[in-house]
Amino acid sequence: MKKTLADFNFFYSAFSLATNYVTRCHYRNIVERGSENIPWGEHFIIAPCHQNALMDPMLILQSFHSYKNPVVFLARADIFRKPAIRAILTWLRISPVYRIRDGRDQLGRNEEIFNTAREVVEKGVPLCLMAEGRHNDKHQLLPLVKGMFRIAGATQVELGDKPLYILPVGIDYDEYEKPMSSAVINCGKPIDIRAFVDMYKENPPVALNQMRDALTPALKGLMHHVDSTEHYDEEFAYCHLMTQATLEKLDLDNDTWGRFQARRHISLQMAQLTEEEREKCYAEGAAFADECRRKGVPLWFASKNLSSVQVGWTFVILVAFVALLSVSHLWGKWLISNLMVYLPTHLIPKYKIKDPQFRSSVNYGIRLVSQFLYTLVVAIIFFITQGFLAGLMISVFSILSARFMPLLFARLRDVYYYFRMII
């Protein structure tokens, strides 16, 4: 019997353990909130905002990982054009969705795709669709596409009295392009589709609009949504300028979650200001952004208010690490060879990928492949030249280095930014 996307796949589940680890290694910090809202054991569709190309689904996989029922995704069809890529994506439990830009003759194929998606949800497997249909390079929610709501309405009809939920998920990043930023995954209250099923049976277009109207504010409340389009850059910069003051005002911790809450609060407050007051905020934000650009410091770092004590401890950690390696000829070789992984993951996206939105995703893909090959090759070399124990130890250290080496480089980057700010 042919397996479907909803069926259990042992090899995929084992592979996902590796990808989830690499996802953790890709970020300095991943903050998850609202996990109590996930309706495990029920039928549900995950509806995240789409902020950062491939990294959004990788964060969803990491946060919603279930060994028995990994998440199934729907993605735009244009990435499935090459047969080899299509085979890989299908194995990764990703199915295509066709849009008008793919050709009107292709739209008819969505009926089969939507039927498959409905079967996935009916079997109790989480289904994920990016609510906006395309990623955005700004902290703004784009208009939601209706494909998800068509699947939800038809599935709820099939389920009858059994509930189907749409789970809104907000995603936020300190920085889109580079690795070792911090990420926030914020799950909201699930939306019960039974509330719309009667209208769906009577007038589907109206029901689809009602579902969209329910999901849109839910998502905006879970992410940092900058409402202004014309003055986006100024408002976004102002949110970072006022982060520390807002942390003190709201008695929030100066950490990833606290700063995210502060920035979101500032945007909500700005929406209530008069036009004259907002213009003043925009001017302050523009001046702050100009100052950061002049010093070569990103907004997210400028808003952290890193202290000299933290910088001092970073120096201590770096010196201790180098000293530890210097007393061991074996680990010195390991450190040098580790650059074989670190350098390609940073240089190739920076100089070869023109679209900034895909640089982090390409970095992730290179890291996933190169780290596996590096660990395998180095383990074999050390096993042959140094013996079994050395080969085993270097394998373990290589896997661990995938996590703490980027953290060390990120700390070093913090020190660099700190001195750029005070000079």
Protein language model features and the residues they cover:
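Membrane-proximal, non-transmembrane alpha-helical segments
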Residues: 270-349
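Soluble catalytic domains of membrane acyltransferases
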Residues: 5-19, 23-206, 215, 321, ...
